[in-house]
Amino acid sequence: MKTTTTMLLCLITMLLIASAHSKEETAMRLDMKHRDSLSPNPSPYHRIEDIMGMDQKRHNVISQKIKTTKGGVKMSLGSGFDFGAAQYFSEIMVGTPAKRFRVVVDTGSELTWVNCRFHGQGPEKLENRHVFRAENSSSFRKVGCMTKTCSEDLAKLFSIAICPTPRTPCAYDYRYVDGSSAQGVFAKETFTLGLTNGSVTSVRGLLIGCSSASEGGASFREADGILGLALSDYSFTSKATNIFGGKFSYCLVDHTSHKNVSNYLIFGSTPSSTTTEAPARRTARLDLSLLPPFYAVNIVGISIGEEMLNIPPQVWGVKKGGGTILDSGSSLTFLAEAAYKAVVTGLQRHLVGVKRIKPEGLPIEFCYYTSKFDDRKLPQLTFHFMGGTRFAPYRRSYLINAAPGIRCLGFVEAKAEATNVIGNIMQQNHLWEFDIAASTLSFSPSTCL
């Protein structure tokens, strides 16, 4: 367990649901746990290797999807459904009567789905996972394959344009570059949601994928499905924010926390009990039209200490192939080549005398023996938003635990022209509020407890 707390965990993408539907202002809150708290412990280096592999594949898909979006082309891959590593879990209640499912929380995915059996298709049971038996739910309503919803609206969610009979359900084949996939049929279902005031409410007619098959062990390990939180017409976020107040928030505990420590996702107003450091609250513009369906922000620079780094403006410009998103499904932070080199060079100057190490199998570039290193010697790294807002992550969020006595700079070099991604380790121990209605992003330090 000691080793577990000192190694880099592969988290994700985010969070879960909720807020409220009553006369008094209330919201829904779900607990989230880090994926690795539920799994046997691999070696430290294998864990980081897994993180890097999955993060890199995720970043490739994000960049590819953003490029096609700018060209007005619909692509059937790269919804942000993250690839195994860097995951957080939550639980949702689906169907009537409601059944509980553990799902991967993913802010880059547009589709919510669960392992499912319908009309004899799908698994009877799965080891350590649950299967939704659709025919036992009185609220399950399949989407027909001849409907406009199937042929047009769900096309970017990988609906299949094959319709043998008018009664055939609308099918999907969700595939990802790492070989992961999910196949099934679309339906509308009832979700039972817990509220912050202790009550529950039911929301009817939410889109869900009834997955009769899925492949990709690392991606779906320990999960019953996926909760899609990217912002699109049919994502959970879109429907939940319409119902529960136009905003959602989440707080990711330190990535080395044990499984008995939960973080949360809330749809609706953030309870005052979670905003313990209101004076430190910062607000920036959330540009929802910039890189859809991802949550884009306008970063204009990075400083180390009092020094603003020399990073070309085109790194941050979407029209030049850059731009920046916040992504709870990537654990590390990706920076375009010019930004990456400036950041690691700037930080290295303050690590002179600290022994550098390149452990076998460890794919991060800059790692050090830091058992006797004082974090306070490392200057503050700060992200600068357009308009003057600043985000100053904790030092342990960019000099991250990799193995006992070893810490690494938590950055990955992306291609020269690539989307910058602020991963979940950089976001940890901050409360993040995404106000969809106002197009603002607010954040402040928090214990997330």
Predicted regions and their residues:
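Aspartic protease catalytic domain
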Residues: 2-42, 84, 95-97, 105-110, ...
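Short secondary-structure boundary/capping segments
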Residues: 118-122, 223, 340-343
